[in-house]
């Protein structure tokens, strides 16, 4: 007998009578386990379901054994989220987020005790920061929740639960066991199409016809996260002395950043959640007295005097001036790609539909050097279409050294220098290049 065979742990395990690991769990048993762990609602989706195909690769990369995704819902308290005092709202966001993670972790522990492998993804942060500004999340909770029958996406790009409305946070658990019955999406959208989220959004990110300006949302609401934080750090680095720093950053902003670093990053708005009346448990006050609902919940957020963070020349920049002139604008930097792939993948995020008005053009982008790539960009009727490869006849061709192009986007290289040295070449007229540039933040 080898030393391994004589090891106390090995001999103890081999002497046990172990229960066989279940190959399939009854869905109702799994549901009961999740609800008893503290979830307010739960649904189950096999990983091979077509409606979560976009999530499959990411999940299997971190947990190759995954067979089923469990989507859990935890409610938030409504009145704190509605408060114009966003410290109160953020306290609710933070504690509710922690609750989701606690519930998901408890479910994983109980499954593990039954011999079932499981893994829970974070409700929000931490994420895979090394992938920034690309896809830094392991799984998108929202499409999983929709597939699991926990609601539908509202105009504001949040999942609306049929009962609890927008006042929920989501978690996802990966398990390596099959179930006997998966969940199905709800057959209607709880969104009541009131468009109060459109009216309340301070940067005009939510469009009444259904569009969404993700860059405007991220730039303001996530000011103290992600690239908003790096923008602040660069103000610190660029300041010559304390007086110069105070010229760049107000004392209130410095304290706000300290607060986020000390107690968890705070959202600047999330007004779209605050004003949403959808959901069976939420809807009555809106139906019973709409003017009172508007006066008590929507108007205080619209009338609040606050700093709004926008990229100069963006659609949000113009929107704040036009719709909320009593709010104070502050110009900040946009997302900065670090790779050509990242640039192409995030073009739809930074595209400015308002700035694209009147442009009807097809662009061929040819990148050479360290990161060669080709793409066809169509801007037409204030919409953007990105295709890999060179397709059709272009109105303008831009050929650029990849590192020079990225340096230009990151404001580390001059476009004039790049054109003079031939590192960026344009066929079709510089006016086309200028029109192209107007459509994207930076």
Regions found by a protein language model. Give the residues of each.
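Non-catalytic, usually N-terminal nucleic-acid engagement modules in DNA/RNA processing proteins
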Residues: 2-102
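Structured loops at beta-to-helix junctions and adjacent beta-edge loops in soluble globular domains
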Residues: 73-75, 176-178, 368
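Short glycine/proline-enriched loop/turn "hinge" motifs that connect secondary-structure elements
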Residues: 60-65, 160-167, 390
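Residues that flank catalytic or metal-binding motifs in active/ligand-binding sites
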Residues: 66, 169, 272, 361, ...
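Feature captures hydrophobic
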Residues: 296-442
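Catalytic cores of enzyme domains
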Residues: 53, 96-280, 284-296
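Short small-residue beta-strand/loop micro-motif enriched in glycine and branched aliphatics
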Residues: 79, 181-184, 385-388
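Short, charged, solvent-exposed linker or helix-capping segments at domain edges/interfaces
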Residues: 81-83, 182-186, 437
